[in-house]
Amino acid sequence: MPFHLSIPTTPAPDHRLPPKLEGLSRLAYNMYWSWHPEVRQLFARIDRRVWLNFRSPVAVLRAQRDWTSLLNDPDFMVQYETVLRDFDHYMANGREHWFARVHGDDLEGPVAYFCAEYGLQESLPIYSGGLGVLAGDHCKTASDMALPFVAVGLFYRRGYFRQNIDADGHQEHGYFNLQPERLPLLRAVDPTGEPATVSVELPGRTVYAAVWVAQVGRVPLLLLDTDVPENDEADRPITHILYVRGREMRLHQELILGVGGVRALRKLGVDPAVWHLNEGHSAFMLAEQARELVLQGRGLDEALEQVRKRAVFTIHTPVPAGNERFDAGLVRELTAPEAEASGMDIDRILAMGLGADGDASQFDMTAFALRNTSHANGVSQLHGQVANETWTPIIDHPIIGITNGVHPPTWVGHAMRKVLEDLGGDLDHQETEREKDRFWERMNLVPDKALWEAHLQQKARLREYATIRLRRQLARHGESPHVLGELDDILDPQVLTISFARRMATYKRAALLFSDVERITRLITDPDRPIQVVFAGKAHPADRPGQGVIQTIFEHSRSEALRGRVFILEDYDMRVGRHLVQGVDVWLNNPRRPLEASGTSGQKAAMNAVINLSILDGWWDEGYHHDNGWAIGGRDPNPDEGAQDWADAQDLYRLLEEEIVPMWYDRDAEGRPQRWLDRMRKAAGSSLWDFSTTRMLEEYVEDMYLPAAAGR
């Protein structure tokens, strides 16, 4: 099997590049640049203003009109040639990497990975949060490891919503207007040489979808788009908005993803060895493959069993109520045209979507996926246990735990990365478990001065970025020049800084810190040992309680007592997240156990030597080692949620008062917190391998992909 799959595309737009710089187009139209800082530095050098505004190489190429000065700049030309040579080497030498070296030709085709969202970089905003960022990191790591891999998703021209917080703390919703020609997207080309389009039959009409390609290193990501002239005006918006509120529109999206995604691969001549469903949104791809086999003369049972053998499923939600469900009558109505045309028994298909609660009026996407895949996993060891207990009545095979990881080259900050590289570390090539011991050894060798200075550099970057964001935010609220001027003094790097940043679902308890306002105010405003806290996060437009949590935090941030010490940054995205995980001292996470399936933001923080303070849930249940962070509460939650909330808040305050604040402000003769630095080393050393996507993907290959490909 070739080490990567090549999908033919239409040519990149003509940016009138001189022949000596034509390689810039190859760089711009491959998301490789999103995790290789040297490429980003190259494009920033071409036009810093455009780069800072858009963070997109395509935007830089579109804006550039005169290349003469760059052609005559020998330093730039050397930089360009070096970057291009490294990129070409990366793309051409997959057989040097883990999959080819360890597993050779064990797969007869690629892994086809389906997900509703992908977080690759903020300039391509087709993600909402952790699921999409995980999918993006999964693709990047598959590329780095030269795993034969193709990903499938949807192109959301309006993206996920943009968040503003008004002067009263209410969340406001706006949307993008993404234009493909301004993004690193090219149309896939079918074997006839025409731009690829697929179709799905729905009641009374055919819906068409264009197929775009976002190249992610060696991995092609196919994105389906219904906003095409062939469609009725009522169908063009199907793929416009990620997690659109209307249930019927959402079901249309998931049919396009599952059914259309399979058809896109077929049209492009891709024959996957394994099919991976990342969450249940794409479960109709299983029905579509069964339909293909029924049309070839197989019985439905035989067809489903054949599909099942080569399909694997990752479940992300611990409780049944959090899984995707649709009205069974609506599913019947929308799938009837395809089912009737193929002779499939729609009642059998609907029965396989019966959830754990036995409610036949609902079609449960997770239940359907579990029944029709041969291997399934939760996204942490604890989540695997919880999922097994929840879904045992549904399936006859265990749900294993494969703990999520994150992609270190994407998430480790420049200063911390340099510290590791100065000691021989290489985040771009961590391909064996030997790296686990090497990272421990390297972190133990980092001098106090180097580690502390790197951390303060990343805190300074956060301060600069947050000041700009907050000033823009408060100016929109009509704050005075005096108040806006005071923002110059916020987020002092010499003050203990805590962050809580994630989706504002109520089970995550974002406002737990304010359970006892008087006590936390005393802690935060202590004149000798103050604390500053930065919040960020979105609540889904339909989640009114989550939006209420945002308003509560906002009101505390603008209160007389806490103003200037508590902040909430609006429009949480990958860029905000990078600055926070790289630039704070403590990463706070306090969900209700066991409702946090994984929680990868804490892993990103730990890799930057930021210390976690968290409930023992998700990844932290296995990642906590007593000396690499702090655990809030224990492992036996009280069924009385109010009592548990209060108990967790009290333990959080105790840890701050008795351990965290004293340790941070305990300085040696050089002004450095020695005990804190020791814990920082352990935080990074215990996460850089154990919670990397490299480790994660090795487990997917050996525990899921290869067994499924072999029919085991």
Task: Give each language-model segment a name.
Residues 1-712:
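Catalytic cores of carbohydrate-active enzymes across secretory and cytosolic contexts
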